[in-house]
Amino acid sequence: MSREIRPSSLDHVALWVDERQALASFLCDHLGMHVIEETDTFTLVGVDAKLGKLTLFDAEGPRERGSIEYIALRVKDLEAVVAGLPEGSAVDGIARFEGPGGVPLALVEGRGVDFDLDHVVLRLPDREGALAELEEMGFERRDGVLAVGDRELHIVDGDAADGERPLLNHLALLVDSADEVQRDAEERGVEIDDVKDAPNTLAVFLRGPSGVRIEYVEHKPGFALV
């Protein structure tokens, strides 16, 4: 990817889920989120539309975790938040638990807005190769992990086989211009997986290591989600 195209944020994580309503309710009731947008096929939740979000797409279950180890949200007072969960406990600064549909979640103590996205952990074969490929796709390598802005992507060695019912749909990076990403990919002979032109956003999808889909999303002028 051209060095002139630098994503500014890990905007959201999109999942295929078989308990969309139950998971959305859990995230809103226990993890400080609210419904930002909802359609017949997906629900977008987060603490703020301009912070890290989760997109929940309807899919048949059960889903296979495959490449996704867990999704971590940050909070200022880990013990207090964990005490309010139906189950879970903090060990060595992290509390891991499952949401409805077996979605692997975690809480870590950190600065910033409570329940904003902190990091995602993916399990992929050939960790070093995956790190190098994702760095080429716009992530920045910092102390053995990948980062965009103040959010991180961690890669651990493991089997990424998702079977026919993967949990992970895609990871989304916020960019100034999705058109520039598309032009850059075409000039380099990189296959475009998909392009979506929505009322608030324009997005280009590429494939990363082990087929992980990376979305480059541009917020259009007047981006109106809250």
Region spans (language model):
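A short beta-turn/loop motif at secondary-structure boundaries
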Residues: 39, 62-63, 162, 196-199
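Vicinal oxygen chelate
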Residues: 2-6, 82-122, 142-159, 182-226
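Core segments of cupin and vicinal oxygen chelate
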Residues: 2-8, 14-54, 80, 122-153, ...
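Extended, hydrophobic interaction surfaces within ordered domains
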Residues: 21-29, 34-37, 55-59, 63-109
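Eukaryotic phosphotyrosine signaling hubs
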Residues: 10-12, 66-71, 117-119, 166-171
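Short hydrophobic/aromatic beta-strand micro-patches
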Residues: 16, 72-74, 121-123, 172-176, ...
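Acidic di-acidic motifs
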Residues: 19, 99, 126, 177, ...
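Short loop/beta submotifs within extracellular cysteine-rich repeat domains
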Residues: 52-55, 63-64, 153-156, 164
